């Protein structure tokens, strides 16, 4: 237990202890995608309780990138101020912060929108899921820009680090998986191509945002012919080459 309470580091961040609060969606916002009183109470309570590093829940890079209408967003400059205020409160109690920037892809259930994905393969044929459109090369360029701009906003909001969400079957994870990505261009097919989008986003964020970068990935889909542990090892090595400061790995994806 003594090691748990010793100082730790992630990139240039010094943590007062090694207790980390991972990102967990609370679904307590609304169509505004703003932080509510609930969020401020929720995160501040962890900081007061002594958590050393708090990663704020999945925060969308565009409106249709939310998992639901109750998710957070950071796709506009007007959304920065609330996050800045949250960080000020958390930092007062000595905790460091990161924000998980994300796009739900085909798992988005936002009303009156059509989800986007690497291929026209629905997550489920049941409500509330919809059949996605296939991302064009222009769409992919736009997706990269959305992630980079959101990372820039995160820095302006005084987050100490950024976590890129490439797990749990959401958009970036969908590009990684051969079960959800059946493209025949440079973003599909072999492992190198399927990892391309994640690596391109990481490269641009590292170039434009001077903050430690964490990438969350799924270790294994546990499905025949799906993403597996060897794929994760390959991706992790490529991420390390690009200067990623930490890899946050979870057991499986949900595709």
Model-predicted regions and their roles:
Residues 1-254:
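Flavin-dependent oxidoreductase catalytic cores
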């Amino acid at each position: 237990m003594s090691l748990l309470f010793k100082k730790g580091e992630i990139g240039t961040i010094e943590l007062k202890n090694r207790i980390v609060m991972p990102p967990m969606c609370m679904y307590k916002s609304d169509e505004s995608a703003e932080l509510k009183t609930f969020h401020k109470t929720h995160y501040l309570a962890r900081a007061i309780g002594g958590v050393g590093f708090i990663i704020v829940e999945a925060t969308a890079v565009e409106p249709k990138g939310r998992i639901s209408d109750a998710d957070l967003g950071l796709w506009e400059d007007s959304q920065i101020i609330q996050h800045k205020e949250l960080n000020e409160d958390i930092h007062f109690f000595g905790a460091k912060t990161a924000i998980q920037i994300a796009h739900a892809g085909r798992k988005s259930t936002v009303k009156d929108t059509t989800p986007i994905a690497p291929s026209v393969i629905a997550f489920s044929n049941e409500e509330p899921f919809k059949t996605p459109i296939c991302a064009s090369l222009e769409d992919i360029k736009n997706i990269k820009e959305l992630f980079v701009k959101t990372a820039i906003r995160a820095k302006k909001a005084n987050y100490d680090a950024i976590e890129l969400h490439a797990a749990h079957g959401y958009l970036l994870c969908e590009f990684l998986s051969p079960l959800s990505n059946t493209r025949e261009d440079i973003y599909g097919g072999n492992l190198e191509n399927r990892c391309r989008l994640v690596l391109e986003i990481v490269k641009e964020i590292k170039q434009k945002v001077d903050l430690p970068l964490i990438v969350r990935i799924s270790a294994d889909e546990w499905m025949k012919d799906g993403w597996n542990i060897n794929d994760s090892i390959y991706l992790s090595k490529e991420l390390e080459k690009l200067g990623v400061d930490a890899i946050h790995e979870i057991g499986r994806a949900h595709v």
